[in-house]
Amino acid sequence: MLNPGEVHVWRVSLNRGKVRPATTEEALRAARFGTPTLRRRYLRAHAALRVILSGVTTAPLEFALHEKGKPYLASAPEIRFNLAHSRGLALVAVARDVEVGVDIERIRPLPEYAAIAQRYFPPGFDELTGVRDFFRHWTRFEALLKAHGSGLYGAGAAPPGAWSVTEVDAGPNFAAAVAVEGASPNVVIHGYGEEA
């Protein structure tokens, strides 16, 4: 299913369906969210991640963390994945043998977007045309940092090496992007659950 040069991205609705935590750690992490809605969305996103990964590898799902906190499959290190969610919609990106990062943001009013861009974006992002443009660039930049494994810890400069970033259609009120190590991939979009 995962061919070289492809990244598969699943759109996952987080607003319906019952889920239970798979591990004690997952339950403890979910409990830290401030509202029942946020806890349920977290659990649904991680349940979908497990189902999706079990569909691309027959190895048991044994998760571990890289030194900067990016999760990976210790049981199938050739499978690379990333998860992002915003306001009831998640994206799960999966690739083989290349690092991958994904980000999604619901487009919403954000009066301080220019100050945020100035603080976090690398030089050259001074020409934003509005909040929609800000979120397009934000998701591209965040996906790149997540693929690299640095997240906002690495903000202020693009990660070293060759990376490709592709925008993903997540719906009219969202901006989304996927980033991979190396050449621009063929992005294959899937629905999951009610998004199917």
Labelled PLM ranges:
Residues 1-196:
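Core catalytic alpha/beta fold that binds nucleotide/phospho-ligands
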